[in-house]
Amino acid sequence: MDQYCILGRIGEGAHGIVFKAKHVETGEIVALKKVALRRLEDGFPNQALREIKALQEMEDNQYVVQLKAVFPHGGGFVLAFEFMLSDLAEVVRHAQRPLAQAQVKSYLQMLLKGVAFCHANNIVHRDLKPANLLISASGQLKIADFGLARVFSPDGSRLYTHQVATRWYRAPELLYGARQYDQGVDLWSVGCIMGELLNGSPLFPGKNDIEQLCYVLRILGTPNPQVWPELTELPDYNKISFKEQVPMPLEEVLPDVSPQALDLLGQFLLYPPHQRIAASKALLHQYFFTAPLPAHPSELPIPQRLGGPAPKAHPGPPHIHDFHVDRPLEESLLNPELIRPFILEG
């Protein structure tokens, strides 16, 4: 740490504390993520190892945050990243109104280029959300925080935990306890982020997993084996029954959004993971080639992380799984009235 001068604290994520720092010799500004170990014999935490492995296995890409160095410090170690001025969550919080369509297209285009690059390298991020999409001083968006990333198995033979992705951006198969999944979980998250940019607020702001499913089925309708054949194979299928809910047209959810945007959004927000549009294919969608065209990064808003007015939106949800099947319904739900219309009695 002697080679760096700490300039301030940026924040604290699920996988470590992040500081803004300056390299003493070169003057380069970086972001230092300090990861502590409880005991030296523990070795590196799995999530930290995944982040290092994922970033080191991928060649430099302008849409993925650059890992510059890794070094031990005290009872842990430090990751040195290129410094990014802000993140997409701050952009949404500080926007006085929904972003201009050209701005939404630009952010989404950069996100899709980063996701396409990750998926081409067999990396599933598993925690895409606005707070993990960093913004540089020049307006460039880059994907960060690969602490939950995994190299996925194309043949679907590997089992993974379903407790990944922040709840508002968590794919339905994860909410149903899926242990076998692929890049489709990232594509659902991209759809949620796109919807949030178009709407100015999250589409599915559930306070627990059941409420999250209720928000989803209120728009997509109640899932069934005819629409989603793999549904019956999921571990948590039939643990709770939902009333039949017909899909809501996206033009009613987002009445001021263009047909092209709604068409692309609808191709991300699909129950069957294999039917969701791939990031590389989405980049060729007519949405990006109709007026207004994507804005140049220099035309995008860049709010500061520190200082400025207090954010209007409340903090995002935690990663923890706070619904228990055996617990009484009223004890598991923060807002029972919101989901009661969707739940079958008895």
UniProtKB/Swiss-Prot annotation:
One of the protein's GO biological processes: embryonic brain development
Which Enzyme Commission numbers does its entry carry?
A: 2.7.11.22
Per the entry, what this protein does is: Required for high-level Shh responses in the developing neural tube. Together with TBC1D32, controls the structure of the primary cilium by coordinating assembly of the ciliary membrane and axoneme, allowing GLI2 to be properly activated in response to SHH signaling. Involved in cell growth. Activates CDK2, a kinase involved in the control of the cell cycle, by phosphorylating residue 'Thr-160'.
Q: What gene does the UniProt entry assign to this protein?
A: CDK20
Q: What class of enzyme is it?
A: transferase
Under catalytic activity, the entry for this protein gives: L-seryl-[protein] + ATP = O-phospho-L-seryl-[protein] + ADP + H(+); L-threonyl-[protein] + ATP = O-phospho-L-threonyl-[protein] + ADP + H(+)
Kindly identify the residues recorded as the active site: D127
- Under what name is this protein listed? Cyclin-dependent kinase 20
Query: Which SUPFAM superfamilies did the record assign?
Result: Protein kinase-like (PK-like)
Residues the record lists as binding ATP: I10, G11, E12, G13, A14, H15, G16, I17, V18, K33
Please provide, alphabetically and separated by semicolons, the GO molecular function terms listed in this UniProt record.
ATP binding; cyclin-dependent protein serine/threonine kinase activity; protein serine kinase activity; protein serine/threonine kinase activity
Q: Which family does it belong to?
A: Belongs to the protein kinase superfamily. CMGC Ser/Thr protein kinase family. CDC2/CDKX subfamily.
Domain (Protein kinase) ranges: 4-288
What GO CC terms are in its UniProt record? cilium; Golgi apparatus; nucleoplasm; nucleus
